[in-house]
Amino acid sequence: MAESEDRSLRIVLVGKTGSGKSATANTILGEEIFDSRIAAQAVTKNCQKASREWQGRDLLVVDTPGLFDTKESLDTTCKEISRCIISSCPGPHAIVLVLLLGRYTEEEQKTVALIKAVFGKSAMKHMVILFTRKEELEGQSFHDFIADADVGLKSIVKECGNRCCAFSNSKKTSKAEKESQVQELVELIEKMVQCNEGAYFSDDIYKDTEERLKQREEVLRKIYTDQLNEEIKLVEEDKHKSEEEKEKEIKLLKLKYDEKIKNIREEAERNIFKDVFNRIWKMLSEIWHRFLSKCKFYSS
């Protein structure tokens, strides 16, 4: 774990294909940013992120594809886990397991097992369960729904410290009700963070990735600064241009430099992707066959 010093709240959504992760992300973000159509196949193919300002906090939401879609390979899974790690650095405050109202399926059990295998069981201290299709409770209280749930579902709820809530992402649900749901989720996460001594989730993978990102940002910043100084020098030494032309060109060069610096984090993320992928691949390739057969090996 690592202490959180800023006002950001990093939220990673995980769960099986079709559980409503993208629709939930849109509800949290307060607008339709991610494609959340009802489809037979996964709509979200790649890990994606977006953020919003909310009551003085910056909510960063990372939407992941179904990590255990049976059609996907180890290679694809490693790529998406790598993207998730990079997108949520230096570490998520909450790993939100998105489930449809109903039973706790094998694919969802495998997703939790995968999280434990990659990040360790301590990741469960940062997990919240979010049920979608709240409107289908049809008068039944959420408390009663949990009380009547099967053993598997009760077990994962207990393992997550009974941190759970329900969302209705339906277009029929009012904006005010959706914002109330976001309020409930954020309060649940903030309470969890307090229980974790103000810390977000972090481990060796996240720490190493964040360090690589910072180092790469420094290298890129120096490269761009040196390039800018060299280009400015060439402009200043150009005897065929007036002072007014030089000033205008230098101004444009600085604007171009500022744009590069603004996007330096994203470029650093692209640069280190292969290193993170190789680490995840090495870790999972040794145990992948076990996930494809018995997830219980990791769920215990």
Swiss-Prot record:
Region: G5, residue numbers: 168-170
Tissue specificity of this protein: Most abundantly expressed in spleen, lymph nodes, and fetal kidney, but also present in the heart and the small intestine. Lower expression levels are found in lung, kidney, liver, and thyroid, salivary, and mammary glands. Also detected in the thymus. Detected in T-cells.
Feature type site, description Important for catalytic activity: R103
Binding site for GTP: T17, G18, S19, G20, K21, S22, A23, R37, R133, K134, E135, N169
PROSITE patterns per the UniProt record, alphabetical: G_AIG1 (PS51720)
BP GO annotations: GTP metabolic process
Keyword Electron transport tagged: no
Organism ancestry: Eukaryota, Metazoa, Chordata, Craniata, Vertebrata
A single Gene Ontology CC term: lipid droplet
Native source species: Homo sapiens
Function summary: The dimer has GTPase activity; the active site contains residues from both subunits.
Quaternary organization: Monomer in the presence of bound GDP and in the absence of bound nucleotide. Homodimer in the presence of bound GTP. Heterodimer with GIMAP2.
Main location: other
G4 as annotated region, ranges: 132-135
The name this protein goes by in its record: GTPase IMAP family member 7
Region (G2) location: 42-46
Keywords for this protein: Cytoplasm, Endoplasmic reticulum, Golgi apparatus, GTP-binding, Lipid droplet, Nucleotide-binding
Pfam families cross-referenced by the UniProt entry: AIG1
Start and end residues of each AIG1-type G domain: 6-210
Domain of life assignment: Eukaryota
An example Gene Ontology molecular-function term: identical protein binding
Region of interest (G1), residue spans: 15-22
G3: annotated span: 63-66
Subcellular compartments: Lipid droplet; Cytoplasm; Endoplasmic reticulum; Golgi apparatus
